[in-house]
């Protein structure tokens, strides 16, 4: 991790909430947000060993959310063809 990055699960949650896009943001913005969160939580899982499994849960959650958004974007693209 680079200097200044979250080192605890709590810090990661705060970063996620601070950078959360508006509810009406473009789905591609939400996709980038979710994928970034997944990377963040995976990195924190390696550092905050006391919350390793919980951080991995959140990484998986964010990946699932990203998968849903990606599927919606693909469905929209197919229907536009």
In which residue ranges do the predicted regions lie?
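Long, non-catalytic architectural segments outside compact domain cores
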Residues: 1-81
């Amino acid at each position: 991790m680079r200097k200044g990055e979250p080192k605890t699960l709590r810090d990661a949650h705060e970063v996620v909430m601070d950078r959360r896009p508006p509810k009406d943001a473009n789905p591609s913005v939400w996709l980038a947000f979710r994928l970034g969160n997944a990377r963040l939580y995976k990195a924190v899982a390696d550092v905050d060993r006391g919350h390793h499994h919980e951080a991995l849960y959140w990484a998986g959650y964010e990946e699932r959310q990203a998968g849903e958004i990606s599927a919606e974007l693909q469905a929209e693209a197919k229907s536009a063809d």
